[in-house]
């Protein structure tokens, strides 16, 4: 029935340029933007953009089927898309993350593509706000409000280096939030650095043009010299103008002072004080301009000096080259003469002629050596370094940081709130009758008229209702603003009172009731349109809401549809994959819930969940025969035991079997850090026993044996406490086969091995069963595979230890320079596949970095590393990952998790590289 009702839409969609049947990803949606030309929805998804066609949106809303998207790779794992904005006068968009920005062309939004790295710029600080405008057909002016100040960049499409910093104002107080916009051509800024301030930024386009001309002609000395002298002439004219302007301002100031002293009473309507305020702004602007001009003049003088030295060096090089050309021509003449002498047959003349040729060749070789010497290369490097320093001095990047109030040429508004009242969002409503700026915090909403420079209205909540805002957006059908925290969306309406006779219009803010949302994920972005809203979530969810058309103020939700299903509610803390033989299950946890998901082709479906957050999971292998698995889930101060099983042929159930906790001497619960299961544990029919170990924050590992009865209460017996005195905390913990269970535990530069943790004799805490290893670097990750223990270190090393079966381990070897030239140093989140061969044990070791999955192979023979090879560093798409897991039965597929999940696959070439090291044997 669905196919019949939507077949005409499918035909239209398939005929569209670049239409792709791709499933949406499960990464954080930090930005939503509706393209005005054709109604496409652009959604930031991690570091990429997902484009959803308007017909696809309509189809999903009517059928409740997940949308299909076109994916455009922008930042990948390097950043998260935070904002998508149109570039006025073009069909292109500018995309920014926390530290990166990119220009994305409209044609790239039709096809699944990757943005060129040359169009991606990394900024020197965290990006707070961006403003972009078109200057010509090939050039854009980009303004960035960073945590460290305001930076102007030029983007030129015709140069190899597209981006160039042309003006910078560095501030001495970190800016945490803000907004940039243009009104009547003037650049306005609103920001929060402990104070809420709104003002106009003074822009000097002539200064920007100078920096751009110097950067473009940096290797053309003659043109560069003309640029410098032209600028010096302009500065001299500027100095004359500023001197006259300062004299006029001093005259005006003196006359105003005399007027104020002479008048005892203030006359109504007198604008003297306003004139003083304007004069103050003029003096400040002139001070800023004059300071910049003096610094620029000093930089230009330096530039003239280095140009002169460069010209001298160029003259020397040209002289050597001309001399070399002369010597080469003489050498050719000598060779021709030698050939003529050979025809005479006079051996004496032949010998003398060839001696002359060899001498001339030696002279030529010496000249070539001089021309190709390191001195010329050094001169070129020094020139590049000096010209970069001059450009930084001209654009202001090398200037000392100053107060932001000195950067703003005209201060429009200032507000000092409570220190606990931190403003996190600024929203500009340019569609209202009077342009309105909303300043938002978790407690306060202020409405400001920037053109009038005054606060019109404000509203504050009680401190008990304080929340952390994650998104904000201006209303479309009425005046006001929507704010969102992780769980809810709240409207704040901006009302007008009808003016009474003789009184002006009064405006006020009023908080409305929160929207009634269906069960959803943590909200990360919001897009408001007339009578509808779209919400983005942390793990890839998209929720569409339709409002009642009858009222512009009471926004009742009359319909909702999930355009893309989130994988969970909040960031994924831990995930375990279970292969059932028919499908793939994922048991994962967040701060608020524990979820079981099932994979169907490339899409994950939530099957069931339990409320209550967790941060670590240990699980037994899935028993295909018994169709179930046990799980130990670590929460803040307790451990839950759960069973995952098929209740019927295809119905999956997650059952809570109870919980265990530990208390200190004062009866306070002890924080749980991590959990681990005895590797011999398997799923069996209840009742049965389950052995597991728990690492606590009181420097102790407690092991338990639980008698599971199938009821919510179960018998648990604390068998042994390993008090790890040399350590200050339990950082990594893995159980292994002991008598009957042992445990590896690490913290900082120490590794302990405990064996037989299931004994009752607690008197011998420091018996021969414990081994203590002091290491040279901090342990950052731990992995156990097929009788081997792998340790990753903070200094880019990995060590392999072999288990000896008596509660001890021996060092097999260490691999240095693990990341092979990558910027990452810490070896984190190890996963290993092992296979035994006649030659030894082959280990395929995978480690996770911020941007890559690094794969090595090691062959261990006779307790030694026989062979080690680096295979590949696969770049994943998850920004700020927490960990990763293997996909069962697929050696080339991984699941990376953090703020969402990302399914990663090795390319065909990378799989072939791995196959070169796979040992195929028939046993």
Swiss-Prot record:
InterPro entries referenced in this protein's UniProt entry, alphabetically: WD40/YVTN_repeat-like_dom_sf, WD40_repeat_dom_sf
Keyword presence, Coiled coil: yes
Record has Coiled coil as a keyword: yes
Coiled coil ranges: 312-347
Keyword entries, A-Z: Coiled coil
Its job: May have a role in tumor suppression.
Protein name: Protein dct-6
Lineage: Eukaryota, Metazoa, Ecdysozoa, Nematoda, Chromadorea
């Amino acid at each position: 029935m669905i196919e019949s009702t939507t077949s005409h839409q499918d035909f239209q969609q398939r005929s569209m340029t670049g239409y792709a049947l791709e499933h949406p990803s499960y990464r954080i949606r930090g930005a939503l933007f509706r393209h005005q030309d054709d109604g496409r929805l652009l959604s930031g998804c991690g570091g990429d953009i997902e484009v959803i066609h308007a017909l696809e949106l309509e189809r999903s809303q009517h059928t409740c089927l997940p949308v299909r998207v076109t994916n455009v790779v922008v930042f990948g794992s390097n950043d998260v898309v935070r904002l998508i904005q149109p570039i006025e006068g073009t069909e292109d968009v500018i995309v920014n993350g926390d530290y990166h920005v990119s220009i994305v062309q409209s044609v790239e939004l039709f096809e699944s593509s990757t943005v060129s790295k040359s169009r991606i710029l990394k900024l020197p600080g965290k990006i707070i706000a961006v403003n972009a405008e078109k200057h010509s057909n090939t050039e854009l002016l980009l303004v960035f409000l960073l945590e460290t100040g305001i930076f102007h960049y030029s983007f030129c499409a015709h140069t190899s280096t597209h981006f160039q910093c042309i003006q910078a104002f560095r501030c001495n107080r970190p800016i945490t939030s803000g907004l940039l916009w243009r009104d009547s051509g003037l650049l306005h800024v609103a920001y929060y650095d402990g104070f809420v301030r709104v003002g106009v930024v003074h822009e000097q386009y002539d200064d920007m043009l100078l920096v751009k001309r110097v950067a473009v002609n940096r290797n053309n000395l003659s043109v560069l010299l003309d640029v410098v002298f032209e600028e010096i002439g302009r500065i001299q004219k500027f100095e004359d103008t500023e001197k006259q302007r300062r004299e006029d301002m001093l005259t005006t100031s003196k006359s105003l002072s005399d007027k104020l002293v002479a008048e005892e009473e203030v006359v109504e309507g007198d604008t003297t004080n306003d004139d003083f305020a304007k004069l103050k702004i003029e003096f400040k602007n002139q001070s800023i301009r004059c300071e910049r001009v003096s610094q620029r003049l000093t930089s230009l003088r330096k530039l003239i000096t280095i140009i002169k030295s460069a010209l001298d060096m160029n003259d020397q090089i040209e002289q050597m080259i001309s001399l070399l050309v002369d010597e080469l021509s003489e050498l050719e003449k000598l060779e021709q003469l030698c050939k003529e002498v050979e025809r005479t047959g006079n051996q004496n003349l032949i010998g003398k002629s060839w001696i002359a040729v060899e001498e001339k060749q030696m002279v030529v070789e010496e000249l070539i050596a001089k021309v190709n010497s390191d001195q010329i290369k050094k001169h070129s490097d020094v020139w590049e370094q000096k010209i970069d320093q001059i450009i930084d001095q001209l654009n202001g990047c090398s200037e000392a940081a100053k107060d932001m109030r000195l950067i703003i040429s005209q201060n429009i508004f200032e507000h000092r709130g409570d220190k606990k009242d931190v403003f996190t969002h600024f929203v500009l409503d340019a569609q209202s009758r009077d342009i309105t700026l909303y300043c938002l915090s978790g407690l306060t909403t202020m409405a400001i008229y920037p053109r009038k420079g005054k606060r019109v209205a404000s509203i504050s909540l009680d401190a008990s209702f304080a929340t952390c805002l994650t998104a904000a957006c201006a209303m479309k059908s009425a005046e006001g603003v929507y704010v969102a925290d992780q769980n809810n969306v709240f409207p704040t309406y901006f009302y007008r009172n009808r003016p009474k006779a003789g009184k002006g219009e009064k405006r006020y803010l009023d908080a409305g009731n929160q929207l009634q949302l269906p069960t959803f994920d943590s909200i990360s972005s919001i897009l408001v349109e007339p009578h509808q809203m779209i919400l983005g979530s942390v793990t890839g969810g998209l929720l569409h809401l339709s409002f009642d058309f009858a009222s512009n103020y009471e926004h009742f939700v009359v319909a909702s549809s999930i355009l893309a299903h989130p994988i969970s509610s909040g960031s994924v803390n831990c995930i375990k994959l279970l292969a059932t033989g028919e499908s793939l299950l994922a048991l994962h946890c967040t701060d608020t819930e524990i979820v079981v998901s099932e994979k169907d082709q490339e899409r994950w479906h939530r099957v069931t969940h339990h409320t209550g957050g967790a941060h670590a999971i240990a699980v037994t292998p899935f028993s295909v025969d018994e169709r179930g698995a046990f799980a130990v889930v670590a929460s803040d101060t307790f451990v839950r035991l759960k069973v995952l099983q098929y209740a019927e042929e295809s119905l999956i159930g997650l059952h809570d079997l109870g919980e265990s906790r530990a208390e200190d001497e004062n009866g306070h619960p002890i924080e749980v850090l991590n959990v681990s299961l005895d590797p011999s544990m398997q799923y069996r029919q209840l009742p049965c026993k389950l052995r597991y170990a728990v690492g606590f924050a009181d420097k102790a590992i407690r092991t338990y044996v639980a008698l599971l009865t199938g009821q919510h209460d179960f018998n648990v017996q604390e068998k042994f406490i390993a008090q790890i005195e040399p350590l200050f905390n339990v950082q990594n913990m893995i159980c292994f086969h002991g008598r009957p269970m042992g445990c590896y535990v690490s913290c900082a530069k120490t590794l302990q091995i405990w064996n037989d943790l299931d004994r009752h004799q607690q008197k011998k805490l420091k018996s021969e069963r414990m081994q203590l290893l002091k290491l040279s670097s901090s342990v950052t990750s731990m992995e156990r595979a097929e009788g081997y223990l792998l340790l990753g270190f903070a200094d880019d090393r990995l060590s392999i230890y072999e288990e000896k079966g008596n509660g001890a381990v021996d060092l097999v070897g260490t691999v240095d320079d693990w990341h092979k030239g990558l910027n990452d140093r810490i070896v984190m989140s190890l996963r290993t596949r092992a296979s035994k061969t006649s030659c030894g044990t082959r280990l395929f070791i995978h480690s996770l970095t911020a941007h890559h999955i690094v794969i090595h192979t090691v062959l261990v023979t006779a307790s030694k590393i026989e062979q080690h090879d680096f295979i590949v560093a696969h770049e994943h798409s998850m920004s700020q990952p927490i960990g990763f897991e293997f996909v069962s039965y697929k050696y080339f597929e991984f699941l990376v998790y953090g703020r969402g999940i990302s399914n990663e696959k090795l390319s065909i070439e990378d799989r072939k590289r791995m196959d070169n090291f796979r040992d195929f044997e028939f046993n």
